[in-house]
């Protein structure tokens, strides 16, 4: 992993393919704020998820070890600090961070991830899901052992991660044009 951190966002997306290998990351937490699911997409490895006891520093470092940039939505405020507390990892210090929430704000856009997905036609199988419902699904899985809630939670997390790729492309196009669409 590379030392350093992205501080400013002005012009970031004009640089094309920047900072080597990217990892797109999203986490889900339980009611107490403990990480229960991690979803990551990076080339060439593709998509991987960890949940339950497999959420650990070794697994995360194994996937992110070559990443130079971690792409998230609100990751600078939520995902990365939460992983730092839960797994004792300093991902902000180890990789560049591209938080698409900050990018969309710099473009004058409003709304959260799901609202932006709707605005720009990014589809979801898990439409209507949100972070609170994700917590409830995890609790149902833990208390009942039923796989249905876990499968839905994992699908929701996967869509959060994979939709970051398309959202980044859209924001990059907007940044290159110099105006919000």
Regions found by a protein language model. Give the residues of each.
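N-terminal accessory regions of nucleic-acid-interacting proteins
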Residues: 1-19
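Hydrophobic, well-ordered secondary-structure scaffolds
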Residues: 14-17, 31-35
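Two-metal-ion RNase H-like nuclease active-site motif
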Residues: 19-30, 157
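Anionic group-transfer/hydrolysis microenvironments
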Residues: 26-30, 41, 74-76, 101
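Short catalytic/ligand-binding loop motif for oxyanion handling, primarily in non-cytosolic enzymes
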Residues: 32-33, 79-82, 165
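Short conserved beta-strand segments at catalytic cores or DNA/RNA-binding microdomains
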Residues: 32-44
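Conserved DEDDh/DEDDy metal-dependent 3′-5′ exonuclease domain
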Residues: 47-120
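Acidic, Mg2+-coordinating catalytic module of metal-dependent nucleases/exonucleases
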Residues: 121-181
């Amino acid at each position: 992993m590379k030392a350093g951190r992205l501080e400013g966002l002005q012009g970031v997306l004009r640089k094309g393919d920047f900072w080597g290998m990217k990892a797109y990351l999203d986490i889900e937490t339980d009611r107490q704020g403990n990480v229960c699911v991690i979803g990551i997409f990076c080339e060439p490895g593709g998509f991987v998820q960890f949940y339950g006891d497999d959420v650990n520093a070794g697994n995360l470092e194994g996937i992110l070890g070559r990443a130079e940039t971690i792409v998230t939505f609100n990751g600078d405020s939520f995902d990365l600090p939460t992983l730092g507390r839960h797994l004792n990892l300093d991902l902000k210090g180890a990789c560049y961070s591209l938080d698409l929430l900050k990018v969309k704000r710099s473009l004058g856009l409003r709304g959260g991830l799901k609202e932006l997905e709707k605005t720009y036609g990014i589809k979801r199988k898990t439409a209507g899901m949100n972070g609170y419902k994700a917590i409830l699904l995890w609790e149902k899985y833990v208390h009942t052992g039923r796989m249905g809630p876990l499968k839905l939670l994992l699908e929701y997390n996967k869509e959060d991660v994979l939709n970051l790729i398309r959202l980044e492309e859209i924001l990059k196009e907007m940044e290159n044009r110099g105006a919000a669409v």
